[in-house]
């Protein structure tokens, strides 16, 4: 794995094209450029290894979530929000054959053991355009035809066509006030529109449910839906009023993702592995790849642990001290003390940085997608610090032939 520089003379045009042609509407976060000046190159062997590990992790995760859905007593250990726990009985009609299951596993190169996986983005993983259009733009800019890439968008289109056969209405459900959410949905919606689908963009509360079927309630679009493509996190969705959201949990309309995704989205997922293994469900790959994860109150005098929120996203509230800004670290520690059940402790691994030709070193998070159990491409980000957060830069992933 290595970094290859986007030629300095071409970077300005590359950035403009990323914004206007590749849906990269958030190229800046505060004072940080969030579009890397590099491409990440995987060897053929590295790509094959990550795909193999990703599929094994995904198989374990999907078997586990089905079991948890039938065993509420065990699922309670995940510290699911009360409103979601109340909905679990409604999810007993879940049929994986009628839905599309999308996940993304976060791989990190480790100095000592090759790869570690820190979590699975089980509910609403993003980065669709960055993992579909940006690699093609980078390859063209670098001018190296010996590099290839996997387009997430094309894999997703294939999965949806299998379910809907290029017919029907799809609602792209997202937080409509956020442009960075809209860019994810706009790319996927535009691509699906080319396949012949009727695409509607709306918020989670723009759907009503009748006898398990989803209907759009927007003016000029009041119709039955054939697919809900959701990018609103479940823990946000359940705060919405009026309370129409409970229809998502027993919905018979094809969904990507169905709320069953909440089980693995909880970072407390490792705390149910013993129960799963007692039911003869192997978590061998997860145990091998995830750093040691324990309850906050078990840390005591143990060294080398960091705290992570149970439902954190984009690296927020993780206590990697050198990556924290201002009094952020102290605030997180105080919050951990006040709300220990909202956090967990994870053994910090030794991230292997990659060196750029600017003399700086960069830490990598390689997000590996699955759709319906099959590998579906990469979404990667890099940072000068070993915490991949909102300040990190998106980087296209290319693969040596």
Predicted regions and their residues:
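Preference for protein termini
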Residues: 1-401
């Amino acid at each position: 794995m290595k970094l290859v520089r986007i030629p300095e003379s071409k970077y300005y045009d590359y950035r403009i094209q990323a914004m206007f042609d590749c849906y990269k509407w958030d190229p800046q976060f505060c004072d940080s450029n969030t579009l890397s000046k590099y491409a990440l190159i995987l060897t053929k062997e590295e790509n094959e290894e990550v795909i193999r590990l990703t599929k094994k992790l995904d198989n374990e995760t999907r078997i586990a979530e089905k079991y948890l859905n039938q065993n509420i007593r065990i699922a309670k250990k995940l510290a699911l929000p009360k409103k979601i726990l109340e909905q679990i009985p409604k999810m007993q009609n879940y049929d994986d054959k009628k839905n599309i299951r999308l996940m993304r596993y976060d791989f990190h190169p480790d100095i000592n053991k090759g790869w570690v996986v820190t979590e699975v983005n089980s509910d609403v993983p993003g980065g669709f355009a960055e993992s579909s259009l940006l690699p093609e733009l980078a390859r063209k800019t670098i001018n190296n035809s010996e590099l290839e890439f996997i387009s997430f968008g094309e894999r997703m289109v294939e999965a949806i066509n299998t379910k809907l056969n290029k017919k029907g209405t799809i609602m792209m459900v997202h937080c409509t006030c956020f442009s960075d959410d809209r860019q994810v949905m706009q790319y996927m919606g535009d691509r699906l529109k080319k396949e012949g689908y009727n695409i509607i963009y709306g918020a989670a509360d723009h759907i009503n449910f009748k006898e398990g079927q989803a209907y759009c309630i927007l003016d000029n679009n009041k119709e039955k839906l054939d697919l809900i493509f959701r990018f609103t996190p479940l823990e946000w969705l359940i705060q919405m009023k009026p309370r129409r959201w409970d229809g998502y949990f027993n919905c018979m309309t094809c969904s990507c993702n169905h709320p069953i995704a909440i089980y693995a989205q909880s970072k407390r997922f490792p705390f149910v592995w013993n129960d799963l293994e007692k039911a003869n469900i192997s978590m061998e790959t997860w145990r091998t790849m995830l750093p040691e994860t324990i309850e906050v109150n078990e840390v005591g005098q143990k060294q080398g642990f960091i705290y992570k929120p149970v439902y954190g996203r984009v690296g927020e509230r993780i206590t990697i001290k050198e990556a924290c800004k201002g009094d952020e670290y102290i605030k997180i520690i105080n919050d951990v003390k006040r709300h220990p059940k909202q956090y967990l402790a994870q053994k910090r691994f030794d991230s292997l940085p990659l060196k750029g030709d600017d003399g700086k070193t960069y830490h990598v998070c390689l997000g590996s997608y699955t759709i319906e159990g099959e590998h579906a491409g990469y979404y990667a980000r890099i940072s000068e610090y070993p915490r991949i957060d909102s300040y990190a830069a998106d980087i296209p992933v290319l693969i040596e032939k």
